[in-house]
């Protein structure tokens, strides 16, 4: 039998096995409420939360985008690992505070917090719209990554479009049957699989390269720009490096499927362990494994074989391992993608249903009606993102970094200033956030970088300045909940 078909069989078998786990878990559950369906009743323990945090943060980007970035730009991309220390600290300090407030005041989203803190429905809707837009872009790209992985490892046994349909169908089943509790359980399994898979992929790449020392020696001789900043393409300038440390960590932490983990945590211990899991997993994946894979691509694969940098890992696996090992590694890549897809699909549907459609009715409809609407929205979000994925951009790395993360980072000023500064006003937060988003999209559409600084930096800091200045100058009284926060 064709090895491509066998490889596809391994992947489908994996997807079915995860579905069996979901069905078994779903049968044990009592009647679901919105809180249970979206946040697992705020009861995820200190074993499952770190694993679901790893799975949520490590998408198909770890297997496709990251090796592609190292292949294209070299070691400068390691700044991603360095910047994630900030994300871990945010989880510990900001995440625990919002967890306590959410337990006390019933928040299910960032929008709930902003509405309560500033007494502003506009901020809630704005936060929901920004979060949904950015997350759905990211979600569509996860479908792209999964489909590419299936298509490449199966040697074309399944078409790209068919692979999209498979990814959409299985993600719908996982989420609709399991809800947040099922997603967390699958995340725990898939986190272990993806970590083992990426290490195995690095080993496959290192063996024909002659080991770590020989790999770096050959790269230094053939493409020394890969081992220094700003990299082979000149991307990692001082200004871009600053963005990676300032804006990107906020954007990653404020991804709704990551931020919501704080609301799922059972206690402070669970949250602390999940914070520790972030740098450990980031170093293992991005500091070592994908670095070796990306650099090995320059030594082992001719440029003519690499149509897109995102495909360097699948190419290496097919070329330097047998079909079964390649299938297992790509199954791990798909595990990374499915775990993120599930979390993003769940949280996007939560934001659309609870913060937008049921904006004024959430407390006035029955639990059955709420769940019916929520499940319809899950289906609709998956369908829309699947359609987007059918005609994707050539590479999804820049879409993720330049739109999704930097757009979500604009939510940081109203959130953090509102939490730690009592004088922060509704008007200041509203104007700052609106201006930040407008500048981000305006500069991107126009393709301009004033004074050489990218638009997302202008948007982020003008957002902060406007929020602070208007709050200081305005005569608007404190929101009644300011003291609480």
Regions of interest found by a model, annotated:
Residues 1-485:
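Membrane-embedded helix-loop-helix hairpins and adjacent transmembrane boundary segments
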């Amino acid at each position: 039998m064709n090895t491509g078909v066998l490889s596809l069989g391994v992947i489908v078998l994996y997807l079915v096995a995860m579905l069996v786990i979901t069905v078994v878990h779903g049968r044990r559950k009592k009647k679901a409420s919105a809180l249970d369906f979206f946040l697992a009743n705020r009861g995820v323990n200190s074993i499952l939360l770190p694993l679901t945090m790893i799975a949520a943060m490590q998408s198909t980007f770890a297997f496709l985008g990251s090796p592609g970035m190292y292949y294209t730009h070299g070691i400068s991309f390691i700044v991603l690992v360095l910047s994630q220390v900030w994300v871990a600290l945010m989880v510990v300090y900001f995440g625990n505070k919002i967890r306590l407030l959410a337990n006390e005041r019933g928040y299910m989203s960032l929008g709930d917090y902003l509405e309560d803190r500033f007494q502003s429905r506009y901020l809630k809707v704005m936060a929901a719209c920004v979060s949904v837009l950015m997350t759905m872009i990211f979600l569509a790209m996860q479908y792209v990554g999964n489909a590419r992985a299936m298509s490449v490892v199966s040697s074309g046994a399944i078409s790209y479009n068919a692979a999209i349909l498979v990814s959409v169908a299985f993600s719908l089943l996982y989420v609709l049957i399991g809800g947040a509790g099922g997603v967390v359980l699958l995340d725990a399994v898939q986190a272990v699989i993806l970590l083992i898979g990426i290490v195995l992929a690095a080993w496959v790449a290192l063996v024909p390269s002659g080991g770590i020392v020989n790999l770096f020696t050959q790269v230094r001789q053939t493409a020394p720009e890969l081992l220094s900043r700003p990299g082979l393409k000149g991307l990692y300038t001082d200004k871009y490096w600053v963005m990676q440390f300032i804006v990107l960590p906020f954007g990653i932490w404020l991804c709704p499927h990551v931020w919501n983990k704080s609301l799922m945590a059972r206690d402070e211990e669970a949250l602390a362990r999940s914070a520790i899991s972030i740098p450990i997993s980031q170093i293992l994946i991005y500091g070592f494994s994908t670095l070796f894979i990306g650099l090995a691509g320059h030594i082992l694969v001719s440029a003519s074989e690499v149509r897109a940098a995102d495909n360097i890992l699948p190419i290496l696996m097919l070329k330097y391992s047998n079909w079964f090992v390649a299938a297992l590694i790509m199954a791990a890549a798909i595990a990374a993608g499915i775990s993120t897809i599930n979390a993003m699909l769940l949280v996007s549907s939560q934001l659309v249903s609870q913060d937008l459609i049921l904006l004024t009715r959430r407390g006035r409809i029955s639990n059955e009606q709420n769940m019916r609407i929520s499940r319809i929205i899950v289906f609709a979000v998956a369908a829309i993102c699947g359609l987007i994925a059918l005609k994707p951009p050539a590479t999804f790395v820049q879409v993720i970094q330049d739109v999704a993360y930097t757009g979500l980072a604009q939510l940081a000023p109203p959130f953090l200033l509102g939490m730690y500064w009592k004088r922060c006003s509704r008007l200041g937060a509203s104007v700052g956030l609106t201006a930040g988003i407008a500048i981000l999209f305006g500069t991107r559409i126009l393709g301009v970088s004033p004074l050489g600084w990218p638009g997302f930096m202008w948007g982020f800091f003008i957002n902060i300045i406007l929020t602070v200045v208007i709050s200081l100058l305005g005569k608007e009284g404190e929101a009644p909940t300011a003291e609480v926060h």
